[in-house]
Amino acid sequence: MSLLVEIEKQLGNFHLNVRFQAETETLALLGASGCGKSMTLKCIAGIMTPDRGRIVLNGRVLFDSEARIDLPPQQRRVGYLFQNYALFPTMTVEKNILCGIRSGSKAEKNAALTATLHRFRLEGLEKRYPAQLSGGQQQRVALARILVYEPDVIMLDEPFSALDYYLKEQLQFQVREVLRGYTGDVLMVSHSRDEVYRFCEKSIILNRGQVAMKGETRAIFQKPENVTAARLTGCKNFSRIRRIGEYEVEALDWGLTFQTEEAVAAEHAYIGIRAHQFYPARGSANEFTCEWGDTLCQPFEWDVLLRPVENAGAAGDKENALEREVIWWKVDYKQSDSLNQYQRGDRVRLGIAPGDIMLLKEG
């Protein structure tokens, strides 16, 4: 099973230009709103037509601008789960699912329907209409309709965005179990790094219609190449840098100097530091003084906003600090007891390990 996508599409001022290949895997398209994720899926499904390029699925050409091939959606064998599930509102659950069964006698279709209702735990809901179902039930019906269609590729467009939080994680386990039994390619569009990390072996980072980075999902999270990839994988702290030495940089937006574990190359324009990787100073490398700012309490951690202070204790210190970019520090509640002493304006010393400083390209 394989999917090759090499397409361009101009829509107003937006230019989509993506090239990637999937080989029997679950592949994520991760990016901010408006970066071209859903547009890419619509081009593959035949809902939108690229201006140029090729789309090939398991050796079948779905689209080729030069050869003037553009198969209609019903001939592409693409299963597309829309954000709103796109169930037929005037059809019952069983009729929605039967729409996906392409061939077979009436008895064979009914047997397939019965098996599908059992597999997706929809027994007892056969005669209900979509409006009478919960969000999770609607999603299961939509997935059931896709699977009985036996598509060559399944595309999930923000599959959990319409669900309440308490249902989301439960349904993620159910969807993952369904996909384990599927032998084709799966494309998943999401802006949620948690969903991408849980579901997808490989990821493509999209930025303004372009591929910013692609590779193994875990590798991208551990070592993003550029600012876009780092931001989309959850990094909150960025600073422009000036190279001081092979393993030393000045963080221009913070007025701080850091030692790095990775050699600093000419292409590196920024550093990124994940918010949970700072620690209270303990007499090691890369320690600095900050001014305590706002604190946001979450159920299991604190978010602390800090401003770096250069030359702690010097006159004019406060004015210098106010000009610097803030640093986000995420603190587990298990560590928070020792931090209760701090109030807004207090000084605190933090550290960061050289190996936790990410050297990033621009873009």
Model regions: which residues?
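Non-catalytic connector elements of ABC transporters
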Residues: 5-32, 38-39, 46-49, 60, ...
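ABC nucleotide-binding domain signature
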Residues: 27-28, 70-72, 76-86, 187
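ABC ATPase nucleotide-binding domain helices that frame the ATP-binding cleft
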Residues: 38-41, 141
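Short switch/coupling loops within ABC ATPase nucleotide-binding domains
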Residues: 42-45, 80, 84-92, 98, ...
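A position-specific signal in ABC ATPase nucleotide-binding domains
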Residues: 48-49, 56, 86, 102
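Conserved ABC transporter NBD signature motif
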Residues: 53-65
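ABC ATPase nucleotide-binding domains
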Residues: 77-79, 92-228
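C-terminal boundary and immediately downstream tail of ABC-type ATPase nucleotide-binding domains
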Residues: 222-245, 272
